[in-house]
Amino acid sequence: MSGSDINYMDDLYSKYKSDPHSVDISWQKFFEGFDYSITNSLGSVKFTESSVSQLIEAYRRYGHLKSLTNPVRTRRDHNVDFSIEKFGLSDSDLSQTFSAGSEIGIDNGTLKEILEKLNKIYLGPIGFEYVNIRNTEEVNWIKEWVENKWYSQNIGIDKKKSILTKLNEAVVFENFLHTKYIGQKRFSLEGGENTITFLNEIVNSACDNDVKEVVIGMAHRGRLNVLTSILKKTYDEVFNEFEGNMDPDKIFGDGDVKYHLGYNSYINRDKNNIYIKLIPNPSHLESVNPVVMGYVRAQIDEEYRGNFNSAIPILIHGDAAIAGQGIVYETVQMAKLKGYQVGGVIHFVINNQIGFTTDYDDARSSIYCTDLAKIIDSPVLHVNGDDPEAVYYASQFALEYRQKFKKDVFIDLLCYRRHGHNESDEPKFTQPNLYNLISKHPSPRDVYFKKIIEKDSEIDKGLADKLNKEFKSLLQERLNEVKQKPLPYKPQKKDEEWNFLRNSTSKDFISSPKTSINEKTINKIGKSLTTVPKGFKPIKQIIRLLKDRESNFFDKKLLNWADAELLAYGSLLLDNKNIRISGQDVIRGTFSHRHAKLFDASTNQPYSPLNNLSKEQANFNIYNSLLSEFGVLGFEYGYSMASPNTLVVWEAQFGDFSNGAQVIIDQFISSAETKWEKMNGLLVLLPHGYEGQGPEHSSARPQRLLSLCSEDNMVVANLTTPANFFHLIRRQLAWEFRKPCFLLSPKSLLRHPSVISNFDDFTNSQF
């Protein structure tokens, strides 16, 4: 120890002697041990109590690095040593009692008892990673949960049978598809079937805790199993898709492969209904993450009145994707932001220990694929994929933690992929050693059944065979029915909030719906936009802006671009339509034109004119976003997906920045309607034009957007008058359907004296 360390400890010890509660609990225990065990022997001091405290803390901090979480191969050696000699203890201390044992609930326990409990808690099938969290309340809560609830685990015989039954269904379903549809891609869950255990227990517990909705985002692996086991898509429907029993003439749009499709259903659990939704997604891994978060935020805002506990997002990742895809970082960074927080995401990693053909040591620099959890102080549970009871407890922890602290939580399921990346792929080309191990490894169901019949005499040894035969017989019956009589095409029901809308036709674009307003409404909105509360003192530039705006509305009756935009928003708010706008610097506007909120020069308190139009108006929310395009545009797309009656706007700082979100534009906005029958009314503003910015920030790349236009899938516009902008905004919600719209918005024209519109253009015109 350095001199500064010793001085620091002396100061702490002095504080402790004056008031034990003035120092952290860990130091209290340390100094208790110091006072208790200090003895003089040949001038040395023996810290036996403190040594035991240090041993306990070491297990808490590093135990996850030695936990038994890998079902198929030996873990890497992370040089973690829990030998008692390292802590100044010896075998002669094993029978000695230590008050430090009270830290883990063993008052005056022997060192042997303390070690046995620590090994059971921290070196078992779950590796708990939480000590790095900087919130003491959270750490203490987790510590209590781990060292009491997890340690005292006691799963009853009925729950064990329930877990086994669900796990059996997951295993048999995959095996059935593998034998009936040889070589067909399905991206099976084999090796990771306890994913179903986790999701099923989350849904069960969510029902018990009055959660109303669970929204899931995941990639292709295991999707068919999740659809049938969790969302109750019928086996008949899945077999019908494998059989190719689809009449293209009866299907709307182009459709998509079965492992990209979404689904939604109401599930009844013990008289409680819960709505479960699986968001459709493309092959672009992790791109669905912000979409799920946006969807859930919209539901929380509009359906559940701000109650974060009513809707839970679950994101299912792959180990290679969560570590490698930057969109994961972008969305995780939203966790605590006012405009984007969802009350915590439950992250679940299907950790196959491989990405297609890439080994984990080529896929990341970090020890764990979940290490980005540290940026938001989230706990991580690394769980053995062959232990469904550990998975059950992990599900309980995830839900309880999320509901209590409104924070993200990560569950890392260490498992394996029995086949290649898809069922026709040969994994032994690149991982022969690993796949030699996997080929000999029993399924998670077989591992679990062997475990419980050895421990529970009440379990019938023939139960596994019985469950296997019964479920396999059921699947065969469903397949036979489909082969004999193919199911007719039945589009999935729309979400309730979309029922009032219809699909568009080509005739809808010949003319626009009525979007004009009367002059009385203009004046009402204009008054709100040009006045501030008594005592509110903006800076002088804003005072000048308000005077100019007042002149535009009440003297000249000529409105510029920003006036027309705010007028459109105000009119929709008075029509009881909510508005949400986000993007980089959108409150002021990149070009200092919008000023949707004003700020007091002395207090910095904001004032929102558009939230002070009327007591009966709808909500206006505008958020400066984190510096992200991909994540934020995906979030707003998801928000709009859930809220067809809300105008959702994303504005790029400059139009060319939209290519940072190209995946969302290509795979969701432009194509979701034809692939998944999902309409969307998102409005995207892209500042565009050669005005002194050189090769960057000049072009919004209209050619790229136009190349995506097909069969009336979206609108691309480039306008020159404020009134037309006004009508375009209102048209987004005036249509009897929804279409995404990209507007190449101006820059210098924002203040050009010729770019104005008179009142008649707003009261007696349309787009």
Predicted segment positions?
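Cofactor-binding active-site loop characterized by glycine-rich and histidine/acidic residues
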Residues: 212-377, 381, 591-643
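Subset of Sec-pathway N-terminal targeting signals
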Residues: 1-34
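Active-site pocket-lining segments that scaffold enzyme catalytic pockets across diverse folds
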Residues: 172, 176-236, 544-547, 551, ...
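Conserved phosphate-handling catalytic cores of large alpha/beta enzymes
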Residues: 355-366, 374-410, 414-420, 428
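Flexible, glycine-rich loop/tail regions that form catalytic "lids" or insertion modules at the edges
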Residues: 47-57, 61-99, 116, 171, ...
